[in-house]
UniProtKB/Swiss-Prot annotation:
Species in which this protein is naturally found: Escherichia coli (strain K12)
Group of enzyme by EC: translocase
SUPFAM superfamilies: ABC transporter transmembrane region, P-loop containing nucleoside triphosphate hydrolases
Record bears the keyword Nucleotidyltransferase: no
Upper lineage: Bacteria, Pseudomonadati, Pseudomonadota, Gammaproteobacteria, Enterobacterales
Transmembrane parts of this sequence: 26-46, 63-83, 141-161, 165-185, 255-275, 279-299
Gene3D superfamilies reported for this sequence: ABC transporter type 1, transmembrane domain (1.20.1560.10), P-loop containing nucleotide triphosphate hydrolases (3.40.50.300)
This protein's name: Multidrug resistance-like ATP-binding protein MdlB
Gene assigned in the entry: mdlB
Protein's membrane topology: Multi-pass membrane protein
Periplasmic side: 47-62, 162-164, 276-278
Family in the record: Belongs to the ABC transporter superfamily. Drug exporter-2 (TC 3.A.1.117) family.
Molecular function as annotated in GO: ABC-type xenobiotic transporter activity; ATP binding; ATP hydrolysis activity; ATPase-coupled lipid transmembrane transporter activity
Domain ABC transmembrane type-1: 25-310
Length: 593
């Protein structure tokens, strides 16, 4: 079990985010002390009224009215100050959360892709949204309450000792009790709060998975199973929350109220019924009033431990993401010129020693067309990801333009090497925004790219042209049109190396022809690396690399590999047989119709 001293580094780091708002926070703290002094003055006025006016049967109207007006004025003044300081704390809290979310998103955007292979998306979303919102409560509720309670307690102690130091000494006996309760609460609540945050992240992750996979869930009638799974996650979160509520219910308000009542009884017994009669009624009233008010800020201080624990745990989760590894790039800013590729004895494993690529060698001259083929799981997409610099190599070296890939800067690598992925990401934005992706590219260049991939006619047919929104995940486009849009996205800034990861799979023949037309247009000034399932699309490749279980088993041109009658020849014959079978089936269907 970690002590408060172990939690302090995280809390200190969270509080440091408030440094840009030191001035408004300082003004808010000053307002708190002034408001506390105004609140504490109320019982002093009533004590004076009882001992000097009621007890002596001296009640001049002007003085009584003046005391009443002063009492009401002080309370209204305190309320106004509390409102003003609340606004200042909220302003600082919103600013802190905004900066924190910016930093978290920046950290997430700069993480290596390998981190997302094992980290559920819902967990990341929970840290950016839910955890940062809990941290907002640290400023709005915890810090504000602690400072306000401290100011109020301090002002009341000054007033109590000024009235009667003996009674004040009895009253402060509650402080050691409060300290013990806070230590016990912190010891037992921390692990429970961590479980609450973890279960909430699991719920977010589950919802994200269900929403993204809704079509599959409904297709295979899995609604009940996923509903049960989400119900179990919700029950776990509920049980953990109930544990915190039970702990709060026992250790906080009821227990402290009991101790406060016992001390109040002690005051009455020691001084209220004292035969010496040295304690005036007004003073006794003031002490009873202060002790009743003292109980509330002390309870608030201990109650805030629950929110403090949640904020610290949320901060740990946020900082874990922020302090995670960053995608590493080199410092060589020189842009790629020729687009040559050299893969020298490269081996790669996603984790441990389970190699998915073994001793791969490949040399691609400038402006050449190289194809990667192989069955599913052979390592084609992995090799493409390595060429993009997404993962560090386990062994060997990749050189682009004769320079180690690891030495290239972020700008040099991303401007020089582009990739069209198998499942293109389409933003819920306009045609134009999906092509430019925030880059400074003219509309004329966008139209040229759309013409190249044969999407210009589609864009013109839409209501607002290239300013037409494409819907969530590009639902207004077909699978083939998404592929063409992804290709246009990389062609607006012609890269030196273009990688197409399974770009000709699962698309219609018309889209395939459009892709081939676009590739023919860029081959003169771009090195092409194509991963193809349809071997008919790569018969013109300068080099074909055949992968099998992570190893390069064959390499050559289409004709050379067919003549060798190896694995490539087997794959080609299987595809021909499949195409002939599909053609005969279509012919039979047309005859029967």
């Amino acid at each position: 079990m970690r002590s408060f001293s172990q939690l302090w580094p995280t809390l200190k780091r969270l509080l440091a985010y408030g440094s840009p708002w030191r001035k408004p926070l300082g003004i808010a703290v000053l307002m708190m002390w002034v408001a506390a002094a105004a609140e504490v003055s109320g019982p002093l006025l009533i004590s004076y009224f009882i001992d000097n006016m009621v007890a002596k049967n001296n009640l001049p109207l002007k003085v009584v009215a003046g005391l009443a007006a002063a009492y009401v004025g002080l309370q209204l003044f305190a309320a106004g100050l509390h409102y003003a300081q609340s606004l200042l704390f909220n302003r600082a809290a919103v600013g802190v959360v905004q900066q924190l979310r910016t930093d978290v998103m920046d950290a997430a955007l700069r993480q290596p892709l390998s981190e997302f292979d094992t980290q559920p998306v819902g967990q990341v979303i929970s840290r950016v949204t839910n955890d940062t919102e809990v941290i907002r409560d640290l400023y709005v509720t915890v810090v504000a309450t602690v400072l306000r309670s401290a100011a109020l307690v301090g002002a009341m102690l000054v007033a109590m000792f000024s009235l009667d130091w003996r009674m004040a000494l009895v009253a402060i006996m509650i402080f050691p009790v409060v300290l013990v309760v806070m230590v016990i609460y912190q010891r037992y609540s921390t692990p429970i709060v961590r479980r609450v945050r973890a279960y909430l992240a699991d719920i977010n992750d589950g919802f994200n998975e269900i929403i993204n996979g809704m079509s599959v869930i409904q297709q295979f009638r899995q609604q009940a199973r996923f509903g049960e799974r989400m119900g179990e996650a919700s029950r776990s979160h509920y049980m953990a929350r109930m544990q915190t509520l039970r702990l709060d219910g026992f250790l906080l308000r009821p227990l402290l109220s009991l101790f406060s009542s016992l001390i109040l009884c002690g005051l009455l017994m020691l001084f209220g019924f004292s035969a010496s009669g040295t304690i005036e009624v007004g003073v006794l009233y003031a002490f009873i009033s202060y002790l009743g008010r003292l109980n509330e800020p002390l309870i608030e201080l201990t109650t805030q431990q629950a929110m403090l624990q949640q904020a610290v745990v949320a901060g740990e989760r946020v900082f874990e993401l922020m302090d995670g590894p960053r995608q590493q790039y080199g410092n060589d800013d020189r842009p790629l010129q020729s687009g040559t590729i050299e893969v020298d004895n490269v081996s790669f494993a996603y984790r441990d020693d389970n190699l998915v690529l073994k001793n791969i060698n490949l040399s691609v001259p400038s402006r050449n067309f190289v194809a990667l083929v192989g069955h599913t799981g052979s390592g084609k997409s992995t090799l493409a990801s390595l060429l993009m610099g997404y993962y560090p190599l386990t062994e060997g070296e990749i050189r682009l333009d004769g320079r180690p890939l690891s030495s290239l800067s972020h700008s040099a690598l991303r401007q020089g090497v582009a990739m069209v992925q198998q499942d293109p990401v389409v933003l819920a934005d306009t045609f134009l925004a999906n092509v430019t992706l925030g880059r400074d590219i003219s509309e004329e260049r966008v139209w040229q790219a759309l013409e190249t991939v044969q999407l210009a006619e589609l864009a013109r047919s839409m209501s607002d042209g290239i300013y037409t929104p494409l819907g969530e995940q590009g639902n207004n486009l077909s699978v083939g049109q998404k592929q063409l849009l992804a290709l246009a996205r990389v062609l607006v800034e012609t890269p030196q190396i273009l990688i197409l990861d399974e770009a000709t799979a699962s698309i219609d023949s018309g889209t395939e022809q459009a892709i081939q037309h676009a590739l023919a247009a860029v081959r003169e000034h771009t090195t092409l690396v194509v991963i193809a399932h349809r071997l008919s699309t790569i018969v013109d490749a300068d080099t074909i690399l055949v992968l099998h279980r992570g190893q390069a088993v064959e390499q050559g041109t289409h004709q050379q590999l067919l003549a060798a009658q190896g694995r490539y020849w087997q794959m080609y014959q299987l595809q021909l047989a499949g195409e002939e079978l599909a053609a005969s089936v279509r012919e039979e269907e047309s005859l029967s119709a």
